[in-house]
Amino acid sequence: KLQLRKFKNAMSNEVKQTFERRINSLIEQINFLNKQDDYDEIISNLSKYLCILIAGYTEKMFVYYLNKYFENKAHPKLKKYLSNSIKHTTNLQMTKIEEILCKFDECWVETLKKDVDYQEYKDSLQSIYDNRNKIAHGEISNIGFKSLEDSYIRIQKFFERLVKVMGS
């Protein structure tokens, strides 16, 4: 069991690192193109892809951190149930995150809401998912690269804060 747990942790961490590498690489490529002339359409298309990656990253990391939390705290059967019930979580706007977190501990949500950056976290998630859904359904999305980059940074900070809240 210990070997399997170590393997799962390594795989989860590998998924996190892979997402972050892909996102950071794409940010670097777009920054390079921003310094050139006449690449607006390419930057726009890459930004849409970046939006989708950030949404996927958000979903994977939320599940990862919840699984990590109850890894050593729950009975194996309960752990399996919890893991299966959250693994296909999508469209993680703040209301959905709050709803899921309340099922574990309402204090987590109360603490997060007191964070000075809470509204920025919420707005970033809203922007990412509104635009991801527009892109996925063929609608026009005017989200800019800088806005995406800022949202990504805020989402990373949100997860840092969430981990602290869950650990306290």
Regions found by a protein language model. Give the residues of each.
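C-terminal structured interaction module
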Residues: 143-168
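Short, flexible helix-adjacent loops and helix caps
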Residues: 35-38, 66, 70, 137-140, ...
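Flexible secondary-structure boundary motifs
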Residues: 71-142, 162-165
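Generic structural signal for well-ordered, non-transmembrane alpha-helical segments
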Residues: 17, 24, 52, 56, ...
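Short, hydrophobic, well-ordered secondary-structure elements
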Residues: 44-67
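A structural signal for well-ordered alpha-helices, especially hydrophobic packing surfaces
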Residues: 27-30, 34, 61, 132, ...
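Charged alpha-helical initiation segments
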Residues: 2-47
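Short, solvent-exposed segments of well-ordered alpha helices
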Residues: 13, 17, 41-49, 119-126, ...
